[in-house]
């Protein structure tokens, strides 16, 4: 399966591939 987008992104960047920092400050699938 795909990596889960669940990390926080207070700096505006997500480490998980295919994830965007939206809605801030949580990463979600883009």
Swiss-Prot record:
Belongs to the cyclotide family. Moebius subfamily. Pfam families: Cyclotide. The keyword Mitochondrion does not apply. The keyword Transferase does not apply. There is a cross-link at residues 1-30 (Cyclopeptide (Gly-Asn)). Signal peptide: none annotated. This is a cyclic peptide. Probably participates in a plant defense mechanism. The presence of a 'disulfide through disulfide knot' structurally defines this protein as a knottin. It comes from Viola arvensis. PROSITE patterns: CYCLOTIDE, CYCLOTIDE_MOEBIUS. Keywords: Disulfide bond, Knottin, Plant defense. Disulfide bonds join 5-19, 9-21, 14-27. GO terms for biological process: defense response. This is Varv peptide B. Coiled coil: none annotated.
């Amino acid at each position: 399966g795909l990596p889960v987008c669940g990390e926080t992104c207070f700096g505006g960047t997500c480490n998980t591939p295919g994830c965007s920092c939206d809605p801030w400050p949580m990463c979600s699938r883009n």
